[in-house]
Amino acid sequence: MSVWPWSLPEEWRARQARRALPASVRERLRHVRLGFLDRPGLGQPLALARFVALDLETTGPRMLEDCIISIGAVAVSERMVRHDDAYEALLRQDRSSAVDNILVHQIGGQEQLAGMDPAEALVGCLEFIGDSRVVAFRAEFDATVFEREVRRQLGYRAWPRFIDLAALLPAVFPGTENDTLDDWVAHFGLPPIGRHHAIADAYATAQLLMIVLEAAPRSGIETAADLRDAEQAQRWLGRRR
């Protein structure tokens, strides 16, 4: 994983990253970018939309500095969690993360050093996402880290649209006191999850999204635009408190 000196102009770093990509990765990335241009509009009914529940495990909590260790993603379409439509990758690190981080994620130093090439893993994730909307719990963190790493490793600005499940849940189920992913999992009586594992957290996010999509029409949420508006309104309310 190359680490570019951040004192240099960003566009120069991006060009260098693009030039360093193998031809096969550049071609895959070109197809993904072209496909995204044909993405469905915000008027698409929720029943027809494909969502991707995404979770990232990182080398630390600093979203502007730390790197992605692992990616877990699960598709939700036709209001079903698609267990056969998932993506998981462990990204190779230049050096293993700190011991306390390893204890949290249970991904040892040797595993980290032997992971997948980061550019390959990120292109694979973008291919899996396609033109779908990405859903994450506390999405600001995942979106910031993902977009930064795509820019650093691939030389492009990431284009997936992130929806924050932490804002959607109270928008559709007002009056609850839940805050964390574990709180919501327990609230709906879902099976306990193996926390701090990307694919496990992605499955939990997908199950909670399913519950939101089933209840959304009762709140007048019928389209992707309605879902976006409900999320944004809830985030605005959260900032006002």
Where are these regions (language model features)?
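Acidic two-metal-ion nuclease catalytic site recognized across multiple nuclease folds
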Residues: 2-41, 208-241
